[in-house]
From Swiss-Prot:
Pfam families reported for this sequence: UPF0102 (PF02021)
Recorded family membership: Belongs to the UPF0102 family.
Provenance organism: Helicobacter pylori (strain ATCC 700392 / 26695) (Campylobacter pylori)
UniProt GO MF annotations: nucleic acid binding
Domain of life: Bacteria
Name by which UniProt lists this protein: UPF0102 protein HP_0823
InterPro entries from the UniProt entry: Restrct_endonuc-II-like, tRNA_endonuc-like_dom_sf, UPF0102_YraN-like
UniProt-listed PANTHER family: UPF0102 PROTEIN YRAN
Length: 114
């Protein structure tokens, strides 16, 4: 696991906090934040219409943040999701989403693995 400096971590936490507000405005219910497993972390777990959404929040100003979600990152997310589901509710319907924060604007990309 890579350790972030405090400034970078604070920026990420601020983006996640703003992301939660945005998601709530879209009708999502926050279930959990920063779920860790031995494989990685899920930034936000939210529920909408009976479906669990595992959401990776990415922010950036000088680049397109979606490119920070690499195939390797997705594999780690999937392993972490499996851990979460095995602990909480193995029969849940779910999807993997990305929430992009750029220049103060939000874009929710649903089902990024398809």
């Amino acid at each position: 696991m890579r350790f972030l400096n405090n400034k970078h971590r604070e920026k990420g936490l601020k983006a996640e906090e703003e992301a939660c507000g945005f998601l709530k405005s879209l009708g999502f219910e926050m279930v959990e934040r920063n779920f860790f497993s031995q494989f990685g972390e899920i930034d936000i777990i939210a529920l909408k219409k009976g479906v669990l959404h595992f959401i990776e929040v990415k922010s950036g100003e000088n680049f397109d943040p979606i490119y920070a979600i690499t195939p390797s990152k997705l594999k780690k997310m999937i392993k972490t999701i499996r851990c979460y589901l095995s602990q909480k509710d193995p029969n849940s319907d779910f999807c993997i989403d990305a929430l992009i924060v750029k220049n103060g604007k939000f874009e929710l990309l649903e089902n990024i693995t398809f």
